[in-house]
Amino acid sequence: LLLLDEPSMGLAPIFIREIFKIIQEIQKTGTTVLLIEQNAKMALSISNRAYVLETGSVVLSGTGQELLESDEIQKAYLGG
């Protein structure tokens, strides 16, 4: 299990992309990754499962792809 808390915080976009590539490589080895991340689009794009928390409670869950495609998520969290 690898726990990552905001690995993109404060980094330039080029470094963020590299960090997420590394996270994907770690996933491919079979390591479970628990990622807490404010960059929702990046996090959801590599997630098998995703949870949206509001004030400490799970308000939405699904696959990363399901949440990326969700109108509710687009409007509330992804600026869509």
Give the label of every model feature segment:
Residues 10-11, 26:
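Short coil-to-helix N-cap segments within the nucleotide-binding domains
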Residues 49, 61:
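Short, glycine/charged-rich "phosphate-handling" switch motifs in NTP-dependent
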Residues 65-69:
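Short acidic-hydrophobic catalytic motif
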